[in-house]
UniProtKB/Swiss-Prot annotation:
RNA chaperone that binds small regulatory RNA (sRNAs) and mRNAs to facilitate mRNA translational regulation in response to envelope stress, environmental stress and changes in metabolite concentrations. Also binds with high specificity to tRNAs. The keyword Membrane does not apply. This is RNA-binding protein Hfq. NCBIfam families: Hfq, PRK00395.1. The keyword RNA-binding applies. Residues 9-68 form the Sm domain. Belongs to the Hfq family. GO terms for cellular component: cytosol. Residues 67-96 are annotated as: Disordered. One of its GO terms (biological process) is regulation of DNA-templated transcription. Residues 72-87 have a biased composition (Low complexity). PROSITE patterns: SM (PS52002). It comes from Pasteurella multocida (strain Pm70). HAMAP family: Hfq.
């Protein structure tokens, strides 16, 4: 489960921290708008004129009003590990 959230958490946290307005599209087509107040593994608390708790399993897409700069060191190390694995696999194939 941690691998699935390695991009999600820093992205949502950047949206929350920078108070970037977002449009959240649900799987049934409904569009919600507001700012991300908080989130956890299962829900996002969206703040507009009222607070709404939106279950993540109901979300299709999160669209920020402007671009977001999120930095994910764990994602970079995952990418490096992946590249090292690919290189090792390639070397093993050549040796065979």
């Amino acid at each position: 489960m941690a691998k699935g959230q390695s991009l999600q958490d820093p992205y949502l946290n950047a949206l929350r921290r920078e108070r970037i307005p977002v449009s959240i599209y649900l799987v049934n087509g409904i569009k919600l708008q507001g700012q991300i107040e908080s989130f956890d593994q299962f829900v996002i608390l969206l703040k507009n004129t009222v607070n709404q708790m939106v279950y993540k399993h109901a979300i299709s897409t999160v669209v920020p009003a402007r671009s977001v700069s999120h930095h994910n060191n764990s994602n970079n190390s995952n990418q490096q590990n992946y590249q090292q694995e690919q290189q090792t696999d390639s070397n093993v194939e050549k040796a065979e």
